[in-house]
A protein has these predicted regions:
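N-terminal secretory targeting modules
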Residues: 1-29, 193, 197-206
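Catalytic nucleophile-elbow at a beta strand-turn-alpha helix junction centered on a G-D-S/GDSL motif
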Residues: 27-50
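Conserved beta-strand scaffold positions in the cores of enzyme catalytic domains, especially
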Residues: 31, 61-63, 160
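Surface-exposed cleft-lining segments at the edges of enzyme active sites
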Residues: 35-40, 62-68, 95-107
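Short, surface-exposed alpha-helical segments at coil->helix boundaries
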Residues: 47, 51, 144-147
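Short helix-loop-beta junction
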Residues: 50-62, 152
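Short connector loops at secondary-structure junctions
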Residues: 59-72, 166-167
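Alpha-helical cap/lid subdomain in secreted, periplasmic
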Residues: 74-206
Length: 206
């Protein structure tokens, strides 16, 4: 349920001890994205891919999932890199703009992705990026074009994994046709956390 309801600390009884410094996570992972990142339809928050990624990597996490409003604004990118409380990050790009692209040209979407990724790329910390996860789409031509735009900029500037590599199974998508179900969230986490672990280990070994 945490961190979405008020929690009142009433105290602790019995023999207890605060965790030692070496028992706490040494790094923090920040995740930006849509309601999928936020954890919608993952049953409970510890089932969302962000929590599972952090668990697999043994790190703390900051979930900046914005339901319906992950619009990749340049201002948001500047805010993310201004924060000094994370060591590596992930950005999920595209799904919240899929309908909006009907109202403005793809060139506007491309300019937004260009500026967003350019800001993130200037920060030395590792940023993992992905495009649309698999979902039941009525306009595959438009979505394919948007996927290619995300790939063009993110693959050059960030640590990119196509969303279809993380989730491309209709049986793991919920009844709304957009959000992964609990098993879908698990698959995203299993695949992406493995990529993250290998990439971060290689960077540490340099």
């Amino acid at each position: 349920v945490l961190p979405y309801v008020p929690v009142i600390f009433a105290g602790v009884e019995g023999r207890t001890a605060l965790p030692a410094a070496d028992q706490l996570p040494q790094k923090t992972y920040l995740a930006y994205g849509s309601s999928i990142t936020h954890g919608s339809l993952s049953l409970i928050q510890p089932d969302c891919y962000v929590f599972r990624n952090a668990q697999a990597l043994g790190v703390d996490y900051l979930n900046l999932g914005f339901a319906g409003n992950a619009l990749m604004e340049e201002e948001m990118a500047n805010y993310l890199v201004s924060r000094r409380d994370w060591d590596f990050a992930s950005v999920e790009m595209g799904i919240n703009t899929a309908e909006r692209v009907k109202e403005f040209p793809l060139e506007v979407f491309e300019e937004r992705i260009d500026r967003f990724t350019a800001v993130l790329a200037r920060d030395p910390r590792p940023v993992f990026a992905t495009s649309f996860f698999g979902y039941l789409d009525e306009d595959t031509d438009r979505t394919d074009k948007m996927r290619r735009i995300v790939r063009r900029y993110a693959a050059e500037r960030l640590i990119f994994t196509d969303g279809l590599q993380l989730l491309d199974d209709e049986t793991l998508i919920s009844a709304d046709g957009t959000h992964p179900d609990a098993r879908g969230q698990e698959q995203i986490a299993a695949r992406w956390s493995r990529i993250m672990a290998e990439t971060l280990a290689n960077r540490t070994a340099r």
